[in-house]
Amino acid sequence: MEHHKHDTFLGGIVKALGLVFGDIGTSPIYTLTVIFTLTQPTIDNVYGILSLIFWTMTILVSAEYAWLAMSLGRKGQGGEIVLREIIMKLVKAGRLVAFAGFLSFVGVSLLLGDAVITPAISILSAVEGLLLIPGLEGLSTGALVAIAAAIAIGLFSVQHKGTDRVASAFGPIMALWFGTLAVTGAVSAFSMPQIVEAINPLHGIAFFRDNGLAGYFVLSEVILCATGGEALYADMGHLGKRPIVRAWHFVFVALYLNYLGQGVFAIAHPDAKNLLFGMVRSQAPALYIPFLILTIMATIIASQAIISGVFSIVYQGITTRLLPLMRVDYTSRQIKSQIYLGAVNWSLMVAVIFIMLVFRKSENLAAAYGMAVTGSMTITGIMMIIVFSHTTKKWRALVALVVTLIAAAYHVSTFSKLPHGAYWSIILASIPFVTIIIWTRGQRTLYRALKPLDLETFLISYEQIYAKGPIRGTGLFFTRETDVVPPYVVHCIIRSNIIYERNVFISLMISDEPLGVETELIRGIGPGLDAFRIEAGYMEMVDIERLLKENGIQEKVIFYGVEDISTRNPFWRFFSVLKKLTPNFVQFHKLPASRLQGVVTRVEM
């Protein structure tokens, strides 16, 4: 994942607008509209809600992500998997590591589940703007869903081509989008300048006082203004910290100006169906259609950023052995971090369209949205408390605690959405979560069941067989570690006497750093036996074939183990099916098929 050090001050900000802020940037399309369908837009309520929005964005985006989380990068990388790796390095062992690991599993699963709902609500809400065009008022809900689904299908269908060619346009389009949000909001707010007083937190407190428990549950809708805030930290590796934080200052002002404008419009037009579209149409009817086109483009860019983010999260999960191996294609020759995972892409597309068909309207989706986001924010907060409490900046742990308690309060408020479909967040997140749990446990159990042989014992038999006369050429054998020998190698060399003039044990170890590749060739472990260790960061795209050539290893044949799992346990059966459906190690690393030789080992689990 490259840092773009050559970007200008403005260039870095514009790029960040296109890559990072799409999700949070499209929140004004539906946030206040949804809130004021549930809460009467009286002057007091509008002031209270606008105050809550300001402080929600300040605490849960500016403080939690732009300040606290972004101070915890590893070589510029961010995200919950990175936090997990930081904790594992700081804490080393014990229950805290296991707890942090479990939290990261839940956090990653929530983000992946959320990646289904976010494109669905963004695209649907934009398409619903067609209803304000004269002559299109009668469009049925089914027609709107069909248009939204067609846009989603088009977006997912071009993923395999990569976004290299069009990505340069994302930033300027989103800059225009945020500029438009700021101007339209400011124009509306100008008719009632005192609306700026909504920043005062006393208005938010008064809202809770006047509305009681119902006021608290409104937080489950207010949080919609901060969805996508986690992208600041998760996407840090693409651009670096500074351009993202600088861009956030502009985005914050643009978003809040628009919310202020919508608040004024809501007071004057309490029956408006969509506050953003209604406000823009009332200001400049002739420019409404161009604005709607810009809105749809912004939601497509936001969805694209989410899809790319999912590819990145899943790749991190694969390399850190949380998720099964999947076919990975590189869509850019210049930027190695631009990847495409077909299985993830099509699964995500089916899930997004399914959610559109289930909920049919953006307001229905909004009623179910927010549980995963607030859960993820709470988990990030807990993990930051663990990290800061183990560093010299322990005072930050107290700040993180306050932020986490606030995030948790929002999360609890979203439980009121369960009857309205929020359970879909749990269902969607449970799919990656169950996969992670079964895959990680299955790998550990399988490794123990394989009973690898220690190197010293193996060498006694190896030396005797080598003395009888090896086959010409070089044979490569993939092993998990260089000091233990897996059963398939024992079967190959000791039992079947398949031994070459040069035999190389290759092990790929994942380091606790995100980037960097180091290799070590250990010669003469035994007669004609070398070991080749590769240690790579968990964000690295490792080209094993290139590394072999660089170290003068010219293979004749590549051996690898294939486990034939026998089990009655339903969990391990699912694990076995996952292993069969997904590529094996050598296929994942695209090693030449003509030289591959799989050796089957039967394993009881």
UniProtKB/Swiss-Prot annotation:
Lineage top rank: taxon:
Bacteria
- Keyword field: Cell inner membrane, Cell membrane, Ion transport, Membrane, Potassium, Potassium transport, Symport, Transmembrane, Transmembrane helix, Transport
Molecular function, one GO term: potassium ion transmembrane transporter activity
Q: How does it sit in the membrane?
A: Multi-pass membrane protein
The Gene Ontology CC terms held by the record are: membrane; plasma membrane
Where does this one sit in the cell?
Cell inner membrane
The GO biological-process annotations, alphabetized, read as: potassium ion transport
Would the keyword Cell membrane be found if you checked this record's keyword annotation?
Answer: yes
State whether keyword Protease applies. Answer: no
Q: Which reaction does it catalyse?
A: K(+)(in) + H(+)(in) = K(+)(out) + H(+)(out)
Q: Which residues cross the membrane?
A: 16-36, 49-69, 97-117, 138-158, 170-190, 212-232, 247-267, 287-307, 339-359, 368-388, 397-417, 418-438
Q: What does this protein do?
A: Transport of potassium into the cell. Likely operates as a K(+):H(+) symporter.
Which protein family is it in?
Answer: Belongs to the HAK/KUP transporter (TC 2.A.72) family.
What the entry lists under HAMAP family is as follows: Kup
Q: What is this protein called?
A: Probable potassium transport system protein Kup 3
